[in-house]
Curated annotation (Swiss-Prot):
Belongs to the ThiG family. The gene is thiG. It comes from Pseudomonas aeruginosa (strain ATCC 15692 / DSM 22644 / CIP 104116 / JCM 14847 / LMG 12228 / 1C / PRS 101 / PAO1). This is Thiazole synthase. It catalyses: [ThiS sulfur-carrier protein]-C-terminal-Gly-aminoethanethioate + 2-iminoacetate + 1-deoxy-D-xylulose 5-phosphate = [ThiS sulfur-carrier protein]-C-terminal Gly-Gly + 2-[(2R,5Z)-2-carboxy-4-methylthiazol-5(2H)-ylidene]ethyl phosphate + 2 H2O + H(+). One of its GO terms (molecular function) is thiazole synthase activity. Its main location: cytoplasm.
Amino acid sequence: MSQASSTDTPFVIAGRTYGSRLLVGTGKYKDLDETRRAIEASGAEIVTVAVRRTNIGQNPDEPNLLDVIPPDRYTILPNTAGCYDAVEAVRTCRLARELLDGHNLVKLEVLADQKTLFPNVVETLKAAEQLVKDGFDVMVYTSDDPIIARQLAEIGCIAVMPLAGLIGSGLGICNPYNLRIILEEAKVPVLVDAGVGTASDAAIAMELGCEAVLMNTAIAHAKDPVMMAEAMKHAIVAGRLAYLAGRMPRKLYASASSPLDGLID
């Protein structure tokens, strides 16, 4: 998918430029064929994979997800879903690098509990610091706290990914004001991660000025995942164009579209 506009700045992650600003996950689909078709329909170029839950080569006797999303076609973004402390998360990233032949790009997420799946920001900061020291390019799932987002960027994370709502909730953009503060201060790309439920949510995230959006459940749990994937592709482009175009100001009173001056009485 091409850039939204010829005047747009490129979307760059770890030195590589991408045409699509939609990143997608691979979980919760009914089978690998549906996974493949939905990802193709989304136009995504970066696909995230839960290393602890998905076979990407560590189990030779099981179906390998990389047969469906080949690394020569997609940028594989291994993530640490299912990790609840920094030690686990760092170990998982090191395993991913080994399985993917030295691949340094990772998505860090350290969860606080199974009920909310909120990020444990204390453990996230610890893990991020170690991973950056180890030479990883870290994209990091975090809360919508602007201070934590700033600290993660200062540590050396290449992108911060604040939640818009709880993972898998479909609640949409719950706190656009915090996201705006993060975006105003950002010195690295900001991507919404978690909470998107439908195409309008993705468009809103992009209209706020986010560089991109990552989603999984919104597509995989739709009645028609392949169709929703295509809807999300268009929503991302529409939202980015709207952001670049600039929204009209809100007004308390009406303003006629057609002037009355010069009309025949």
